[in-house]
């Protein structure tokens, strides 16, 4: 199912993998456990960092080849993704239980440093409340994503789903607590250059933008790369078309396998992110309301669709 070369790399990167499902401890959970530092989602949306699971039901399957992706892409190691067969997709109840079990196994590793973590925080981490379905791969390729989200909600979780927006029919169906669409290009040429996608994929993404106003809580995330897509005003028309609740402008980070495709200089500094956010603020319906220097990210809110950012 997963080529051995990719599996070995993912395991070396500390992915827990079971079938087509994977969990990896977010670096911010580690910082919260050991240094009591919160992630930007805590600052922006009020989540408890140490109680968040980072997972995917489709660990290596994605339609795009984004140059900024820190994950290993099949083409990075000479594998044609079209030659990798889709797995036999497991039922959502099975995937849910696997995600919880893998996450618990990771957190239990902190039992050995309980003096640094603290018993209260450790116990809370063993009872997660949030799940980010965003680790690797494209989650909408998992055919039971809607059912999986509902299972998480039934069990008291808030859900964050991050999608490339290609499968409009799936996006229309799902209702996570917060839906993220990654919009990293402003036209077909930039899409091909940055995301390595097909023309029909770009057209599908545009169709998805048109249905986002019907969703309960939405965010567009744009990963900015110096010299590739940092002319923020070229995005304004698409942002207005989507009419989402929030926009996150985030710098590309020179980590993981992206280091083989881009240079360190392609990252933007936080003051540059803020400058672009203020430019967007002055030229659109979206107003700058928060930022996080550690993550080089700025949050803007749609002044025509105001909701409380905090969950």
UniProtKB/Swiss-Prot annotation:
Gene3D superfamilies the record matches: Aldolase class I
Highest taxon above the source species: Archaea
Reactions mediated catalytically: N(1)-methylguanosine(37) in tRNA(Phe) + pyruvate + S-adenosyl-L-methionine = 4-demethylwyosine(37) in tRNA(Phe) + 5'-deoxyadenosine + L-methionine + CO2 + H2O
GO process annotations (BP): tRNA processing
Molecular function GO labels: 4 iron, 4 sulfur cluster binding; metal ion binding; tRNA-4-demethylwyosine synthase activity
Binding positions for [4Fe-4S] cluster 2 per the UniProt entry: 62, 66, 69
Enzyme nomenclature, EC number: 4.1.3.44
Family of this protein: Belongs to the TYW1 family.
PANTHER family, alphabetized: S-ADENOSYL-L-METHIONINE-DEPENDENT TRNA 4-DEMETHYLWYOSINE SYNTHASE, S-ADENOSYL-L-METHIONINE-DEPENDENT TRNA 4-DEMETHYLWYOSINE SYNTHASE TYW1-RELATED
Annotated protein name in UniProt: S-adenosyl-L-methionine-dependent tRNA 4-demethylwyosine synthase
Originating organism: Methanocaldococcus jannaschii (strain ATCC 43067 / DSM 2661 / JAL-1 / JCM 10045 / NBRC 100440)
């Amino acid at each position: 199912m997963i080529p051995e070369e990719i599996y070995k790399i993912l395991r070396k990167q500390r992915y827990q993998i079971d079938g087509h499902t994977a969990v990896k401890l977010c670096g911010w959970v580690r910082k919260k456990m050991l240094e009591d530092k919160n992630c930007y989602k805590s600052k922006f949306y009020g989540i408890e960092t140490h109680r968040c699971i980072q997972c995917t039901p489709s660990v290596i399957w994605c339609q795009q080849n984004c140059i900024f992706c820190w994950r290993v892409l099949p083409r990075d190691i000479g594998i044609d993704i079209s030659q990798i067969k889709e797995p036999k997709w497991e039922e959502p109840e099975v995937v849910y239980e696997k995600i919880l079990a893998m996450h618990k196994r990771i957190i239990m590793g902190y039992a050995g440093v309980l003096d640094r973590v603290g018993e209260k925080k450790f116990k809370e981490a063993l009872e997660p409340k949030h799940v980010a379905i965003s680790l690797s791969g494209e989650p909408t390729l998992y055919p039971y994503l809607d059912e999986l989200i509902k299972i998480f909600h039934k069990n008291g979780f808030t859900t964050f789903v991050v999608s490339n927006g290609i499968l409009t029919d799936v996006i229309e169906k799902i209702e996570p607590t917060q839906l993220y669409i990654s919009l990293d290009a402003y036209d077909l040429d930039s899409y091909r250059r940055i995301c390595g996608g097909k023309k029909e994929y770009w057209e599908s993404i545009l169709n998805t933008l048109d249905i986002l106003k019907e969703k309960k809580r939405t965010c567009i995330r744009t990963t900015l790369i110096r010299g590739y897509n940092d002319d923020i005003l070229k995005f304004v028309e698409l942002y207005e078309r989507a009419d989402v609740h929030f926009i996150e402008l985030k710098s590309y980070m020179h980590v993981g396998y992206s280091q083989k495709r881009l240079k360190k200089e392609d990252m933007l500094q936080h003051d540059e992110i803020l400058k672009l956010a203020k430019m967007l603020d002055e030229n659109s319906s979206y107003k700058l309301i928060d930022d996080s220097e550690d993550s080089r990210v700025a949050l803007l809110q749609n002044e025509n669709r105001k909701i409380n950012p905090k969950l």
